[in-house]
């Protein structure tokens, strides 16, 4: 067991537990949003591994579901839920909120991914460390924008019953 990976998994899991506890204190819906973001992240990671095979995770992660480390899904949730909380706190208009959420999430990912590949957390296929954005292909960032935008759009739509009323 590699100490760096263990520290990352324990640390991110602890942050997720704290975030889940704080979300639950705000109500059931914020908690469900956080848990659904983690589930969404795990499913997307697993799907990418099976379908596209654009990258592979290090075998040094202690906890994984098939090819996707659980900590990755938890960090997805922390990033996406954190972005939506910031957008909500800033009072961004509902129609622009998913776009702002995406920009906030991609801002974090621009920094995280370049560091993560150098730490050996995962390896991109068909791209070297000097290519793309410090070794990260542009497609990764497009995916983050789309995934965050779509998750935010659906979550915010489900969150607000007035958006679902059908005029007769």
Regions found by a protein language model. Name each.
Residues 1-168:
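Aromatic-rich, lipid-facing transmembrane alpha helices and their immediate juxtamembrane interface loops
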